[in-house]
From Swiss-Prot:
Site (Required for specificity): G222
Reaction catalyzed: Preferential cleavage: Arg-|-Xaa, Lys-|-Xaa
Classification via SUPFAM superfamilies: Trypsin-like serine proteases
Taxonomic classification: Eukaryota, Metazoa, Ecdysozoa, Arthropoda, Hexapoda
Keyword Disulfide bond: yes
Catalytic residues (positions): H87, D132, S228
Pro-sequence residue ranges: 23-46
Keywords, sorted A to Z: Cleavage on pair of basic residues, Digestion, Disulfide bond, Hydrolase, Protease, Secreted, Serine protease, Signal, Zymogen
Species name: Anopheles gambiae (African malaria mosquito)
Main location: secreted
GO biological process assignments: digestion; proteolysis
Protein name: Trypsin-6
Length: 273
């Protein structure tokens, strides 16, 4: 019979094994499920016209994965909680996602963790754009290092000044029909006038107060497919979550982001962060 000490050690090893999948296990998972957001302009998107960065430059960045394949981005809030876009977890009833942290590559390196709980914002409806925010609780706590760090959050209803420059990052497409980027990329874009953005998107229902827009009038750089859920960080704070747009970095159509400050109290009440 196993000694009590041996049994305890075995239980600990099993628990750790369940929390973080090894790279060998991930290679034997099923292929990526076919998934398309209900709204054609939702940005499962990618960084267009950006530049390669190391994960240590954005250590809060995570890859949300289905069947071992990158699907969306997200941000580390603390050792147990991740913030992403609500439309990124619409598949949860069919396929349980995992999270990769601490790697510049979405398909290798770092650590892959299981989720304990997924909490979409109560104001979000499947296929809709408003309150496109969800919290993910990890089964195991993260160990922080140079490649894994939480990002700071704004306070409830903190304003965003027009022209605020932010950095957005992800593994999304660099062209509308290209393959996923293997290496993390980023770009810098300014926030734009809310009324002008709302006018640009009138045929798509407009832009709500819980959203903001960022990009250049001439287009050319921004988010694209599979960047959704990723971070928009300005002055060290996560002020936006990549949500949707019309096409990718198209002139006249800036990217639309979920406004983190509009749900700050809900994040605190739900996660304690």
């Amino acid at each position: 019979m196993l000694s009590k000490f041996t049994a305890i050690l075995l239980a600990v090893h099993i628990a750790l094994f369940a929390c973080a999948l090894t790279q060998a296990e991930k290679r034997h998972k099923l292929t990526r499920p076919a998934f398309h957001p209900n709204a054609p302009y939702l940005a499962g998107k990618r960084i267009v016209g950006g530049f390669v960065i190391d994960i240590s430059d954005a250590p809060y960045q995570i890859s949300l994965q289905y069947n071992g394949k990158h699907h969306c981005g997200g941000s580390i809030l603390n050792s147990k909680w991740i913030l992403t876009a609500a439309h990124c977890i619409d598949l949860y009833s069919e396929v349980k996602p995992t999270v990769r942290v601490g790697s510049s590559e979405h398909a290798a390196g770092g650590t892959v963790l299981h989720l304990l709980r997924i909490v979409p914002h109560p104001g979000h409806s499947s296929g809709g754009n408003n309150y496109d925010i969800a919290l993910l609780e990890l089964e195991c706590e993260l160990t922080f290092n140079d490649n894994v760090q939480p990002v700071q959050l704004p306070e409830q209803d903190d304003p965003i000044d027009e022209g605020t420059m932010g950095i957005v990052s992800g593994w999304g497409m660099t062209m509308s029909a290209a393959d996923l980027n293997a290496i993390l990329r980023a770009t810098n874009v300014p926030t734009v006038n809310q009324q002008e953005c709302n006018q640009a998107y009138q045929s798509y229902g407009g832009v709500a107060e819980q959203m903001f827009c960022a990009g250049y009038k001439q287009g050319g750089t921004g988010t694209c497919r599979n960047d959704s859920g990723g971070p928009f960080v300005a002055e060290g704070k996560l002020i936006g979550v990549v949500s949707w747009s019309h096409e990718c970095a198209l002139a006249g159509y800036p990217g639309v982001y979920a406004r983190v400050a509009s749900v700050r109290d809900w994040i605190r009440e739900t996660s304690g962060v």
